[in-house]
């Protein structure tokens, strides 16, 4: 369950205009980014183009866009930031783990007690300062019972705050992610994409250009995100599996079977080998969408194991190697080079890194803490690059 919750972080990781003052504008920009990322990554479609108006020759219209928007406006995005430093859109994080709900409740109760004590301390300290500044009367000491009582109260509150901080309940594990907002509702069309110019309500739903007879219905009290996910990976959905395996092919060979990996629409390129794409898509579904199994199957194929030797006859017929008669030279990414060097030198630790270096720094301005991050990241340096801390 924790892995499934953490996987929803895909919807929380995108760029955000955190200094946006208007909450509705911020929400609609966030929703647009989520629709754009999901439609491109999973379907290979540019759905976000329909946010402002219909396009004459585009089968995806504004109603389709806002049918999806209703799903995401009914979803709460937890990306974990605090107000301050130009950020006007605070957000919590999602507690995960067996005791996460109980621990989160304990932390919330404790935080309220601590905040109340700090408020009392601030008020008492202010009163004490007023007493100190009070004009002294002739032949009388300014140190009266009022000052003694207030000093005692301030000392007690400081001791209470110290005790609360010392005995804080343990924090649960947290992750970025999304959950249902609890206030699910259909979305109104925003005329010309302006959050303040509202049009008619559009019922939550899916893209009609992908007709699936067994598409799950969205209950009024739910966001529809779960049903949307089921619709995306439905075996009758012609795009999701093809887009997935095409991305894997692109990563392994340097070029996808469809070269425009983010665009399977009319403006994208046609697949160079439709039958191969269909076959791999079927195999992905049979493998229960396992990326590891698909990578293994492709890498064990004769095509992947071809050499990069030149062949004059093949080159004359297919100079771009679109039909994979040889293994194309391709640039290795920096992470793979780093891991290879560590492995060859015997310094690579193959075990998964435990914990989070960024979590050790807490909620800070990373621009000023970058040196601390480098120093604290020493224990990660022998692990694979996938575990290196990335600042977003």
Regions found by a protein language model. Give the residues of each.
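Primarily short, surface-exposed interaction patches in extracytoplasmic proteins
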Residues: 1, 28-30, 59, 102-387, ...
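Sequence context surrounding c-type heme c attachment/ligation sites in exported
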Residues: 3-111
């Amino acid at each position: 369950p924790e892995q499934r919750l953490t996987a929803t972080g895909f919807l929380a990781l995108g760029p955000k205009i955190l200094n946006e003052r208007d909450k509705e504008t911020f929400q609609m920009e966030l929703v647009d980014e989520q629709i754009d990322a999901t439609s491109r990554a999973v379907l290979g479609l540019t759905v976000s183009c329909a946010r402002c108006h219909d396009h004459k020759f585009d089968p995806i219209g504004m109603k389709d866009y806002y049918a999806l928007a209703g799903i995401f406006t009914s979803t709460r995005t937890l990306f974990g930031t605090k107000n301050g430093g130009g950020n006007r859109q605070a957000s919590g994080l999602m507690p995960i783990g067996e005791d996460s709900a109980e621990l989160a409740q304990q932390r919330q109760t404790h935080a309220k007690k601590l905040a109340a004590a700090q408020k009392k301390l601030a008020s008492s300290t202010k009163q004490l300062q007023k007493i100190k500044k009070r004009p002294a009367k002739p032949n009388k000491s300014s140190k009266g019972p009022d000052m003694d009582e207030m000093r005692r109260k301030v000392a007690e509150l400081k001791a209470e705050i110290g005790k609360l901080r010392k005995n804080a309940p343990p924090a649960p594990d947290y992750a970025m992610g999304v959950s249902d907002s609890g206030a699910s509702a259909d979305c109104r069309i925003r005329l010309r994409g302006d959050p303040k110019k509202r049009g008619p309500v559009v019922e939550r739903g899916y893209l009609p250009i992908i007709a699936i007879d067994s598409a799950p219905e969205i209950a009024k009290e739910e966001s529809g995100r779960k049903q949307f996910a089921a619709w995306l990976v439905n075996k009758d959905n012609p795009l999701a599996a093809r887009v997935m395996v095409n991305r894997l092919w692109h990563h392994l060979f340097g070029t996808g079977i469809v070269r425009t990996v983010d665009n399977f629409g009319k403006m994208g390129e046609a697949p160079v080998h439709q039958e191969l794409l269909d076959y791999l898509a079927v195999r992905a579904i049979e493998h229960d969408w396992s990326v590891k199994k698909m990578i293994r199957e492709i890498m064990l194929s004769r095509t992947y194991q071809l050499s990069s030797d030149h062949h004059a006859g093949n080159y004359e017929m297919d100079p771009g190697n679109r039909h994979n008669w040889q293994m194309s030279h391709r640039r290795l990414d920096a992470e793979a080079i780093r891991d290879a060097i560590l492995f060859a030198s015997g310094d690579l630790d193959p075990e998964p890194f435990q914990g989070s270096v960024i979590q050790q720094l807490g909620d800070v301005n990373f621009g000023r803490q970058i040196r601390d991050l480098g120093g604290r990241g020493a224990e990660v340096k022998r692990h694979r690059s996938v575990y290196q801390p990335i600042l977003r």
